[in-house]
Amino acid sequence: FKTIGALPYLYESNLRRFCKTHQGDIDEGLLDVHLWSHERHSFHLKGLLSDDDYALLTGSNLNPRAWRLDLENGLLIHDPQGCLHGQHQAELGRILARTRRLDHHTALDDTGTYPVPVQRILKRLARTRADRLLNQVL
């Protein structure tokens, strides 16, 4: 087993912790978390829609590390008249067709179900708080 193999589990445990923290918002329909599910490829988010008014299109990853380190360009579109609303909804529909909504944090695997080598690595990272550092780096 290679240490890098624990990375997807670290991502999943971070997502589970986030969803557990915000479970009330998920229950009330204030927060939707969708998991990408496609048999042939993964999805790497590169855009953001906000309130049918703003769209951010970028080559940059949408995470704090990328915003600190990456020097990629982005395009922020302000569309108060909703001229692009139809296009945005169509694209969102194509994306959501390949996702499933996460209703509860317990739908994600608990770290206790991970392979033993992964559990050891994640415990070691958490004990030394290196998981926090890794989250900043990744």
Please give the residue ranges for each predicted region:
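PLD/PLD-like phosphodiesterase catalytic module centered on the HKD motif
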Residues: 1-138
